[in-house]
């Protein structure tokens, strides 16, 4: 049994960082406890070691710390999360402590929040469909178990409502399999936290959810730990309890701002727009924890949500996120201003694994052909609308006018399904056929004749 040493050699506090001198046998990422002069305990983590000095990152902030009277203890292990199946249905703060008034967890074990590196050879390829109940995602940008598919939003757009809708509605089609949602919120307001909790409570979805809430008035440094704690809970449920877990993380922009704050306090050389040069590497340690493992029944699927500063998709946060993840769902100010909910820009959005989770036995045999045809028809319809603005509607051919009609109905009925309508994949595919039947059969060149014969007669415009 190792002896825990106590130090009173704190020499400096700069923002969220503390320097402790004359330390030995201290390791990187080690958990630290700081006992203040009034008996209060705060936690931190070793960020850097140089000779006999350790730099400690404080999770609860540095206000009120008296350097001379503070006692520092190094725990001998990294920050760990107490995990148990009883986590499901509970609400925790950003550090994993219950805040729902329920009893403390009786932990089955303690897990390092940084997780374990996954050998690429042991990864299984994502190829099974997850139904979100949202047509623009399920049909056109299909989400697959084990995928990481971010949502790129902008200021004033309803990404919180979309996140809540996915958390309420997401499911796997095989009802025999256990499904859970892990929700990690970083830097959200009290009103937003109440919105998420109430939305899940009133639909009963909270019974299959685990919520981790880091509020805007919580220490920014806590935001660095929150997504790691949430992913640790997800990995436990997926790979030890054989559950299919969907992890929703919002807002990743707040997480990156916390990284920038720590980097500035460490006086590191800034990278693009003041963010640390290791932002890409740091984000990858989160996003790459999604996936499936050979020999394991469970899976971890991620939907990170971020707000693009100034709606700039070339900003470092969405730019680097796009490199690591497998596509993106982009929300549109134009569609939002027209009253469409959710305002998903389907032409700019992409799921790189959509072909792996669709087809006979997963969704339906007409999934991919109708998806391609809807994309083509909608893109053509938008071109015709632009042409009509320049030349006038009188210059449009009869087929062009049908494309305009299709585009209008596609946006009003398909995209604009609302935040409280849950469409299963069958209803979505049937709606797609109904809209495609507006166009002449000769225009449906991306669908084979046997599928046209099977499905087109079944719909009426």
Swiss-Prot record:
GO terms for biological process: proton motive force-driven plasma membrane ATP synthesis. Keywords: ATP synthesis, Hydrogen ion transport, Ion transport, Transport. Disulfide bonds: none annotated. GO terms for molecular function: ATP binding; proton-transporting ATP synthase activity, rotational mechanism. Gene3D superfamilies: 3.40.50.12240. Pfam families: ATP-synt_ab (PF00006), ATP-synt_ab_N (PF02874), ATP-synt_VA_C (PF22919). InterPro entries: ATP-synt_VA_C (IPR055190), ATPase_F1/V1/A1_a/bsu_N (IPR004100), ATPase_F1/V1/A1_a/bsu_nucl-bd (IPR000194), P-loop_NTPase (IPR027417), V-ATPase_su_B/beta (IPR022879). The keyword Ion transport applies. NCBIfam families: PRK04196.1. Belongs to the ATPase alpha/beta chains family. PANTHER family: V-TYPE PROTON ATPASE SUBUNIT B (PTHR43389:SF4). Produces ATP from ADP in the presence of a proton gradient across the membrane. The V-type beta chain is a regulatory subunit. This is V-type ATP synthase beta chain.
């Amino acid at each position: 049994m190792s002896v825990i040493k106590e130090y009173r050699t704190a020499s400096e506090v700069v923002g969220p960082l503390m320097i402790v001198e004359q330390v030995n046998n201290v390791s990187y990422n080690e958990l630290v406890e700081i006992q203040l002069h009034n008996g209060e305990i705060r936690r931190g983590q070793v960020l850097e070691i140089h000779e006999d000095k350790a730099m400690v990152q404080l999770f609860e902030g540095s206000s009120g710390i008296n350097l001379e009277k503070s006692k520092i203890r190094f725990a001998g292990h990294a920050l760990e999360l107490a995990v148990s199946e009883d986590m499901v249905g509970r609400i925790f703060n950003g550090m994993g402590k219950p805040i729902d008034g329920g009893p403390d967890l009786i932990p089955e074990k303690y897990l390092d929040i940084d997780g374990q590196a996954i050998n690429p050879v042991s990864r299984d390829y994502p190829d099974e469909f997850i139904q979100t109940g949202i047509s623009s995602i399920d049909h056109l940008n299909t989400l697959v178990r084990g995928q990481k598919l971010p949502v790129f939003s902008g200021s004033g757009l309803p990404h919180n409502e979309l996140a809540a809708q996915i958390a309420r509605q997401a499911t796997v089609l095989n009802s025999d399999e256990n499904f859970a949602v892990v929700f990690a919120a970083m830097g959200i307001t009290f009103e937003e936290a109440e919105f998420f909790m109430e939305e899940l409570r009133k639909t009963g979805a909270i019974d299959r959810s685990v919520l981790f809430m880091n509020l805007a008035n919580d220490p920014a440094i806590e935001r660095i730990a929150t997504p790691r704690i949430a992913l640790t809970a997800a990995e436990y449920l997926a790979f030890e309890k054989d559950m299919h877990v969907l992890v929703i993380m919002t807002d990743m922009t707040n997480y990156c701002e916390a990284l920038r704050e720590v980097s500035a306090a460490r006086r590191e050389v800034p990278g693009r727009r003041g963010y640390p040069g290791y932002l890409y590497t740091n984000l990858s340690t989160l996003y790459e924890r999604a996936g499936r493992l050979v020999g394991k029944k469970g899976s971890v699927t991620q939907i990170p949500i971020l707000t693009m500063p100034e709606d700039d998709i070339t900003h470092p946060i969405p730019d680097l996120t796009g490199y690591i993840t497998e596509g993106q769902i982009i929300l549109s100010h134009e569609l939002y201003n027209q009253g469409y909910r959710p305002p998903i820009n389907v032409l700019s959005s992409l799921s790189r694994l959509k072909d792996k989770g669709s087809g006979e036995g997963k969704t339906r045999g007409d999934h991919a052909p109708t998806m391609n045809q809807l994309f083509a028809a909608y893109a053509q319809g938008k071109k015709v609308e632009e042409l009509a603005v320049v030349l006038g509607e009188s210059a449009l051919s009869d087929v062009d006018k049908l494309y305009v009609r299709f585009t209008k109905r596609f946006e009003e009925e398909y995209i604009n399904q609302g935040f409280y309508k849950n469409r299963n994949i069958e209803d979505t595919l049937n709606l797609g056929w109904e809209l495609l039947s507006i166009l002449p059969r000769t225009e449906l060149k991306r669908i084979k004749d046997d599928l046209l014969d099977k499905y087109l007669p079944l719909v009426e415009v």
